[in-house]
Amino acid sequence: MLISFSALVLASQLVIPVADTVPNFNEERECKIDSASAFDPNAGLNATIKRCMDDEQKAKGQLQTQWSQYAPSDKAMCTGLTTDDAATPPSYVELLTCLEGQQLVRKLPKD
């Protein structure tokens, strides 16, 4: 019985719940961390953060519009990939890029 329970516990950790709505990320935190490494000295830090925030909000809006068009398995995989690194905050741009890539892969001819 102990082995069955252990297998059940392990298997339950492999399931990534996928909501019917776009996940909620902290864009400001992501942009402050990202902008520090992608700093544009010609624009300044505030402009770099603003540009990042604009990109994140645009990607979030696109995700909100198109969320239902993505396959549940793609949403689960891409959400997991986007949120798996505790040191790097999740990004709507990365999530959107992953989902768009998955859609393109599905359109490739099958040999």
Name each model-derived stretch:
Residues 11-111:
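Mitochondrial intermembrane space
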Residues 1-14:
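Classic N-terminal secretory signal peptides
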